[in-house]
A protein has these predicted regions:
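C-terminal alpha-helical "lid/dimerization" subdomain adjacent to the S-adenosyl-L-methionine
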Residues: 153-208
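A short beta-strand submotif of the Rossmann-like class I SAM-dependent methyltransferase core
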Residues: 118-122
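Conserved S-adenosyl-L-methionine
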Residues: 211-221
């Protein structure tokens, strides 16, 4: 799926996105709980880059948890970014946010950030070189000692365990209330439009972008966090 097709898809899904995936909140909340500890040592006035911020769930969580932080929200989908902006307005932290509609490479490299989140984004880059280049663009916008928290779907799709894990993941989504049509789209996307790679390979792509060796801090089903 090309960039514009992917952007159009998220534009179409923006209004119903949070409701559609609400049942998966326990996994999201577990990720955020560990994210808090990962970012706990950042400055009280840290600047955080949220790449592919979508409707702004992780931004809202961090804004409430760390009231002195400022955020740069980046997303190519105008509809998603509008919902993120509305969430910031309703949450009372709009003044601590700047919004950039577009892909990461169109965001100025300065000022630098103390941390970055990138959740379920890089997996849509099918070519390993493009994925490493994407992580390099994140690195260019981070200052010395900054921390990247990245999460993607990961597995060895050639292993016998993958089909069992995929079935379990689909059952989980179904029991969480994800509509059948969304499950069908997800299964098709995993085969065609998502680069599901072994966790060690994803970590290698991140490290190749000038980051230190990533440490995996999270896993729930297919979702891994480094």
């Amino acid at each position: 799926m090309r960039n514009e097709e992917l952007k159009d898809l998220f534009d179409q899904q923006a209004a119903s996105y949070d409701k559609q995936w609400a049942g998966m909140a326990p996994i999201r909340d577990a990720l955020y709980l560990l994210l808090d500890s990962l970012f706990a040592g950042l400055p009280e006035n840290a600047r955080i880059l949220c790449v592919g911020v979508g409707t702004g769930a992780e931004l809202a969580h961090l804004a409430e948890r760390f009231p002195g932080w400022h955020f740069t929200a980046v997303d190519p989908s105008a509809a998603m970014l509008d919902i993120c902006r509305q969430r910031a307005t309703e949450g009372g932290f709009l003044s601590r946010c700047s919004f950039h509609q577009g892909y990461l490479d169109t965001l100025p490299a300065e000022p630098s950030h103390d941390g970055a989140t990138c959740f379920l984004v890089s997996q849509f880059l099918l070519e390993p070189q493009a994925r490493t280049a994407f992580f390099h663009e994140i690195a260019r916008r981070l200052g010395p000692g900054a921390i990247l928290a990245n999460a993607d779907l990961a597995s060895d799709v050639e292993s016998p365990a993958y089909e069992a894990l995929l079935r379990s993941w689909m059952t989980l989504m179904s029991s969480a209330g994800v509509p059948p049509e969304a499950l069908q789209r997800a299964r098709a996307a995993y085969a065609r439009d998502v680069a599901i790679l072994p966790a060690q390979q994803v970590a290698g792509l991140i490290q190749a972008a000038s980051f230190e060796a990533p440490v995996q801090f999270f896993q729930a089903g297919l979702m891994h966090g480094w």
